């Protein structure tokens, strides 16, 4: 991986890094900042799709793999949870429409799309303040959590 000594010249998004290195998303090789493993191609695509920022350690670019994103998202939730509010309350607090707010998923860190924000409003689900940022759940993580609850319920029933 190339070194970026000048912080002003560093790309902070994966597509920008690919442009700077004159490569493509499928050919870029980048390590996880936490576990140091090289991201697989699907993880590179997920990182770019989630619009996450690249971090630099000793002038070298790092991303984060799927397992580490899940793990450290949970740690951040446990350490920095502040409060939970409904969508209407969040709009009043921020004085901004819900659809104009950047709200990421609790687990996978994907930005919630308008349909996922609407689902929170319709189902009366709360948004959670974690480390000063409001979080919700994307459809994928919400469905996975529901499946996990059902599985646990079946295991505990006799």
Swiss-Prot record:
A biological process from GO: DNA-templated transcription
Which Pfam families is this protein grouped with? E6 (PF00518)
Q: What is its main location?
A: host cell
Q: Where are the zinc fingers (unnamed)?
A: 32-68, 105-141
Query: Can you quote a single GO CC term?
Result: host cell nucleus
Give the motif span (PDZ-binding domain).
Answer: 156-158
The coiled-coil regions, if any, are none
Localized where? Host cytoplasm; Host nucleus
| Keyword rRNA-binding belongs to the record | no
Supply the alphabetized keyword list. Answer: Activator, DNA-binding, Early protein, Host cytoplasm, Host nucleus, Host-virus interaction, Inhibition of host innate immune response by virus, Inhibition of host IRF3 by virus, Inhibition of host RLR pathway by virus, Metal-binding, Modulation of host cell apoptosis by virus, Oncogene, Transcription, Transcription regulation, Viral immunoevasion, Zinc, Zinc-finger
Protein name (database record): Protein E6
Biological source species: Human papillomavirus 45
Show the taxonomic lineage. Answer: Viruses, Monodnaviria, Shotokuvirae, Cossaviricota, Papovaviricetes
Identify the coding gene: E6
């Amino acid at each position: 991986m190339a070194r970026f000594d000048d912080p002003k010249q560093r790309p902070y998004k994966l597509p920008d890094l690919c442009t700077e290195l004159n490569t493509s998303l499928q050919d870029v090789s980048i390590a996880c900042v936490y576990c140091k493993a090289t991201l697989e191609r699907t993880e590179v695509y997920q990182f770019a799709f989630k619009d996450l920022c690249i971090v630099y350690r000793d002038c070298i670019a790092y991303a984060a793999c799927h397992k580490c994103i899940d793990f450290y998202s949970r740690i951040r939730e446990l350490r920095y949870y502040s409060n939970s509010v409904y969508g209407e309350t969040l709009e009043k607090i921020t004085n901004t429409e819900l659809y104009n707010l950047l709200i990421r998923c609790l687990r996978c860190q994907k930005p919630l799309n308008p349909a996922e924000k609407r689902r929170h409003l319709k189902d009366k689900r709360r948004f959670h303040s974690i480390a000063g940022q409001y979080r919700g759940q994307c459809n994928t993580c919400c469905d996975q959590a529901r499946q996990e609850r059902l599985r646990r319920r079946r295991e505990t029933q006799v």
